[in-house]
């Protein structure tokens, strides 16, 4: 009986250990995801505040100043206001499409953050096809916009959705060709491998210098994918009121608002990863890898800071562009994508392939 009781206690202890392992496993799954989502939300709030301050400076006026010190809580106040607004629905619209559209737009963009390396090995999912996963997922967002436009039963909304789909198709191809050129140089589709390939040669090893034409095309295509001026045709106020967002209010309108800034942030992060060396500081005699070997936490913190500093540099350029260039017409937008960017990006890919073949 004593041996039997001892065996039962041993089995129970093993069962408890296994259950604890499962609990800890679930915790370590949700903690990184929660941390990433919290960081993304904070980043979006910072972008909104920066855009308002930079826009105010360019227009020589005073920006937000009442909601918190220097107006840093203005975006949070606007989001809270949208949460408590009434959620209206068009009486003759397609309710399922109208309701699902904003969620598809936000979720598809959020999934793209899983392959972004914020520092050395600090990535949610280091996949062998990470860069193609981003391209595949980002092509889903325009479907949500088209569903929203069609489900609104409004001619302005429907035109905005059609414009969003046409614009996405026109600029997705040049952007993909630029990514293929980077993959050929790095011999990998993993975002971590692409950053490490640039880190081997320091500052001059950045793909910005090895692919200057691809960088310019990627920059233009990213702005078009984010529907930023001068490419904001799907929601042109003077022509379509608010485009596919015309019939939305409350939290659903807020989701579209958040999706646009999420898309801008993810595009800026991919510019940093693909062309600006990612977390690599690229200063002589200072190596992030050495910092990791000495103090992993300190090295990770420095890597995150460097990645975000490069990202917000591109964000500043996109915000300044908004108040610098006039909006294009729809025919000019499509001509730029199909007649100029597509042939140039294809030629750039062929040149990159030729150089890689001759270097073997």
Swiss-Prot record:
Which is a GO BP term held by this UniProt record? aerobic respiration
Q: Which PROSITE patterns match?
A: COMPLEX1_ND1_1 (PS00667), COMPLEX1_ND1_2 (PS00668)
UniProt KW keywords: Chloroplast, Membrane, NAD, NADP, Plastid, Plastoquinone, Quinone, Thylakoid, Translocase, Transmembrane, Transmembrane helix
Q: Does the UniProt entry include the keyword RNA-binding?
A: no
Segments crossing the lipid bilayer: 27-47, 98-118, 129-149, 165-185, 203-223, 248-268, 269-289, 297-317, 340-360
What molecular function does GO assign, one term?
NADH dehydrogenase activity
Cellular component per GO, a single term: chloroplast thylakoid membrane
Protein location: Plastid, Chloroplast thylakoid membrane
Q: What is its main location?
A: plastid
Enzyme class, top EC level, equals translocase
Q: How does it sit in the membrane?
A: Multi-pass membrane protein
List the catalysed reactions: a plastoquinone + NADH + (n+1) H(+)(in) = a plastoquinol + NAD(+) + n H(+)(out); a plastoquinone + NADPH + (n+1) H(+)(in) = a plastoquinol + NADP(+) + n H(+)(out)
What's one Pfam family the UniProt record gives for this protein?
NADHdh
Q: What is its EC number?
A: 7.1.1.-
PANTHER family, alphabetized: NADH DEHYDROGENASE SUBUNIT 1, NADH-UBIQUINONE OXIDOREDUCTASE CHAIN 1
What family does the database annotate?
Belongs to the complex I subunit 1 family.
Q: Which HAMAP family match?
A: NDH1_NuoH
Q: What does this protein do?
A: NDH shuttles electrons from NAD(P)H:plastoquinone, via FMN and iron-sulfur (Fe-S) centers, to quinones in the photosynthetic chain and possibly in a chloroplast respiratory chain. The immediate electron acceptor for the enzyme in this species is believed to be plastoquinone. Couples the redox reaction to proton translocation, and thus conserves the redox energy in a proton gradient.
Subunit structure, as described in the record: NDH is composed of at least 16 different subunits, 5 of which are encoded in the nucleus.
Q: What is this protein called?
A: NAD(P)H-quinone oxidoreductase subunit 1, chloroplastic
**What is the source species?**
Crucihimalaya wallichii
Q: What is the lineage of its organism?
A: Eukaryota, Viridiplantae, Streptophyta, Embryophyta, Tracheophyta
| Gene coding for it | ndhA
